[in-house]
Amino acid sequence: MKFFQEQIAIKETNILLKVDNPKFFKMAKNAVINERLNLENYILRNPIFLTSYSPLEVPDNAPKIVKLMAEAGFNADVGPMAAVAGTFSQLIVENLIENDCKNAISENGGDICLKCEMDTTVGLYAGNSSLSGNLGFKLKKEKMKNGYGICTSSGTVGHSVSFGNADSVTVFSKSAIIADAAATSIGNFAVGNAVDAMNNCLEKAETISKIDGVFVCMGEHAGKIGKIPQLIKTDKKEVLGNVFEMV
């Protein structure tokens, strides 16, 4: 199957989108614009939503994107903006599915939502760790039939706020929104030496609901908890923005 790829960059949102028909790019861009407008307008009236590191209650009449982010924040005990990248990825894929798109992968700064009718490998990007580019997660098409989230937080790579120093904390969930907030929360516990930091992350992961599994990478050390996709060896030196391939 042929896939088409396009970068959608609007202000802070920078999404790499792969779809099976280029007609979906315009739909996706419009979805980003509309959801950003909803979020920005809410933040103008409620600026604490942008800066809070703690979960926030939001009113019932808040925009859908705001309520989803707030829910994910409470689930992982972090501020709602911890889920922003995964939220955009998921809302785009959901929008495309509603418009009969059969295969869509949205990656927003390491936070991925994908719906594919074929097995797909997602490569591990973990900064300077020797595991980066040498491991991948093989997702079965059955797992992705209704969309699936794979989100990564790092204390050593990227511009997102993390209070820990993990090379990567990758969370797997049916919801990319839930996974994004969870990855941030778990990554905040990556303190101490590599082994202690990894164990701290895995212990925190046990307390978070609605996630399938977690993979933590700390230098030459790695650990997992819960159910994660099959780990396979790869020879792709992954970089941010190029983290998936079809198999």
Swiss-Prot record:
SUPFAM superfamilies, alphabetized: ApbE-like
Position of the signal peptide: none
Taxonomic superkingdom: Archaea
NCBIfam families: PRK04334.1-1
Similarity comment: Belongs to the UPF0280 family.
Name of the protein in its database record: UPF0280 protein MmarC5_0355
